[in-house]
Amino acid sequence: MVHYVKMEDGKVMPIQEMLKSIERYNPEHLKVIEAYVEEQARENQYDLEANLACLKLYQFNPHLLNLDITYIILLKALTNFPHTDFVLCKCLLLPAQMNDETVKEIIYLADILEKCDFSLFWSRLAKHPENYQKISGFHDSIRKFVCHVVGITFQTIERGYLMQLLGNVEEKVLLSWLKRYGWKEEGGLVTIATQEDNIKTKHITEKIEFDNLAPLMANCL
C-alpha cells in the first residue's frame, strides 16, 4: 500500500517521493511516517530511509518522540543483519531513547547477533516475547541471517546443532530451511555448499602501456 502525504499547498505526494525532498524534515508529516513504520511491522516490509527520517524528526522534535515506534524501527533494523542498518538507526537515538530499558534490551540483542551467539540470542528473546510480537516475520528474518553465517562458516554441521542455532526449531521448520538453501542431510550431518561452490576463480588482466615502462627500463640500464 502506497502512503501519501499532503503538502502545505494542498498537493498530495507519495511518501517515497517526499523522503527525497526537504519535506522529509517537516514534522507535520511525522504521523504519516509513523503509520508507515507500523505497516512495515504488520506486512513484513522494510524501508530504511523512511525509518531513518522518522528518527531524525524525533531528533529535531524531541517532544514528539514515540518510543513504541522507536522499538519497531530498531527491531526492523535487526531483521536486516548483516547490513549496518542498526548502527545507522542507533546513531540517531536521543538520550531519552538510549536510556529506555526496552531500547537497551534491543541494543543488547544487536550486540549478541553481531557476535553470532545465536543460542544466547534465542534464549534472551524468549524472556521478552512482548518486544517483537508486532514484527511480522521477525523469527524467519533472524534465521535467514543465521543461515548466512552458517553458509560462510561451515562445510558440514551437525543436524542438532543447526536446529539449535535456528532457535531450537521443529523438524518441519528445519527441513524447510534446508530446502530453501539446497543443503543436504545425511547421517545426522547437514552438508553446506562445498568450498568449490563458494570460491570462484578470478582472471585478472592488467594492461600496461609502454610509456609506463619507460622510466623503469631506464633505471635498469
Swiss-Prot record:
Keywords: Cytoplasm, Initiation factor, Protein biosynthesis. GO terms for cellular component: eukaryotic 43S preinitiation complex; eukaryotic 48S preinitiation complex; eukaryotic translation initiation factor 3 complex. Residues 46-215 form the PCI domain. Pfam families: CSN8_PSD8_EIF3K (PF10075). It is found in: Cytoplasm. It comes from the Eukaryota. GO terms for molecular function: ribosome binding; RNA binding; translation initiation factor activity. One of its GO terms (biological process) is regulation of translational initiation. The keyword Protein biosynthesis applies. InterPro entries: ARM-type_fold, CSN8_PSD8_EIF3K, eIF3k, PCI_dom, Transl_init_fac_sub12_N_euk, WH-like_DNA-bd_sf, WH_DNA-bd_sf. The keyword Lipoprotein does not apply. Component of the eukaryotic translation initiation factor 3 (eIF-3) complex, which is involved in protein synthesis of a specialized repertoire of mRNAs and, together with other initiation factors, stimulates binding of mRNA and methionyl-tRNAi to the 40S ribosome. The eIF-3 complex specifically targets and initiates translation of a subset of mRNAs involved in cell proliferation. Component of the eukaryotic translation initiation factor 3 (eIF-3) complex. Belongs to the eIF-3 subunit K family. This is Eukaryotic translation initiation factor 3 subunit K. It comes from Anopheles gambiae.
